[in-house]
A protein has these predicted regions:
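Caspase-like cysteine protease fold
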Residues: 1-56
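Contiguous beta-strand segments within globular domains
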Residues: 35-71, 178-214
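Aromatic sugar-binding surface patches on proteins
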Residues: 93-117, 123
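Short glycine/proline/serine/threonine-rich loop/turn segments at secondary-structure transition edges
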Residues: 120-130
Length: 218
């Protein structure tokens, strides 16, 4: 029945957007604090440094904001087509389905800086990517949010190095870090795998062998 619908929540409620804003000042060595026609290039194999600040609701530098910033870098948009399981016709739409980087870094006196590696299997589209940012000052219970999309994803860095032949360091345990191999567990143990790599871990999933997977007794 096309007249049936479900109402979840109150449409009159204000969305819980952070009061503080995040502004990106520098991206890949380019001053982007002001609107310009210069779009930095995010190339495969490069390392990009981002600098920014936290702004109060009034637009001033939040010098008392100290905490953690969580950046997420998404690839350019790409077309995705549904499987047409119902035989009613496939639907094509665009979305950012690939995450190039997800991490965290510190915020001190309202300012932050972080560097992220760009994987080789990007879209190479020379179209806009997206940097989504969230920051938290747990001491003062302040949150900040922001986004930046004035950069292009494509090309390969001239100084790209393929010398990384070492896999990530993997620490595996059940329930607690004190667990020793062959030890006893309860009937429903929690499996934990901690991965660490100085060059980053590629989870884009755009190539063979780049998906994280777990095989038990396989």
């Amino acid at each position: 029945n096309k007249l049936n619908f479900s109402l979840i929540g109150d449409p009159a409620l204000t969305l819980a957007y952070p009061d503080y804003q995040i502004q990106v000042d520098e991206f890949a060595g380019v001053n982007v604090a002001e609107e310009t026609n210069t779009y930095p290039q995010v190339k495969a194999g490069s390392k990009i440094t981002v600098k920014g600040r936290i702004l109060t609701p009034e637009g001033a530098l939040a010098e008392d904001f100290t905490g953690t910033v969580h950046p997420t870098v998404l690839d350019s948009k790409e077309e995705v087509t549904t499987l047409d399981n119902r035989g009613e016709g496939a639907y094509t739409y665009t979305e950012r389905s690939k995450t190039l980087f997800s991490g965290s870094d510190s915020v001190r006196q309202g300012r932050f800086e972080f560097t992220f590696p760009v994987p080789l299997d990007i879209n190479y589209s020379d179209e806009e990517g997206l940097l989504s940012l969230y920051a938290l000052d747990a001491v003062h219970s302040n949150e900040a949010g922001g986004a930046f999309d004035r950069f292009l994803v494509g090309g390969t860095d001239d100084d790209v190095s393929l010398a990384d032949t070492l896999g990530p360091k993997i620490t595996i345990y059940l329930n607690t870090p004190d667990f020793s191999s062959g030890g006893q567990t309860n009937t429903t143990p929690l499996f934990v795998a901690e991965l660490e790599d100085a060059d980053g871990i590629n989870t884009v999933g755009n190539g063979i062998g780049h998906d994280l997977s777990l095989s038990i007794d396989g």
